């Protein structure tokens, strides 16, 4: 799996380092591939427990994320980047209590890190080439959403059940990420 991931990253770096303008279809394809890789890694981590049902919580995904078709493509890239960044930050925290395979967590973090670095480069390019303005309300709501997740983990002292709940929530995030990347390909 690691070899496949490295080959995929190398090919994508070749595609994007020579590009001077954003190809949204190609970017959408690449993001979908990366998101699927992350989902696969997250599924491999799963050790759900019915005993954790009492710990479930509604973290309240921002409405604007649920309705991604309202974004401009540049805004969608900004939101996707923020989501990858926050997911990376969450899984960079102490996962030792989970019993998860450390290699799988490291592969997840590597994929997320590469993706967010790549998106930041593309966002810089967009900002340079286009007269792009953005309403910060969506990003603020998104940051508050992820802050609720982090506070939940801290309040539950990073317990196995807390991580189980957060794991399920992050998997749900990839549903929204898929919709955003599909939007880029249209």
Swiss-Prot record:
Keywords: Antiviral defense, Cytokine, Disulfide bond, Glycoprotein, Phosphoprotein, Secreted, Signal. The keyword Lipid metabolism does not apply. Its main location: secreted. The keyword Phosphoprotein applies. Residues 1-21 form the signal peptide. Glycans are attached at residues 46, 101, 131, 136. Pfam families: Interferon. PROSITE patterns: INTERFERON_A_B_D. It comes from the Eukaryota. Disulfide bonds join 52-161. One of its GO terms (biological process) is humoral immune response. Monomer. Belongs to the alpha/beta interferon family. This is Interferon beta. It comes from Felis catus (Cat).
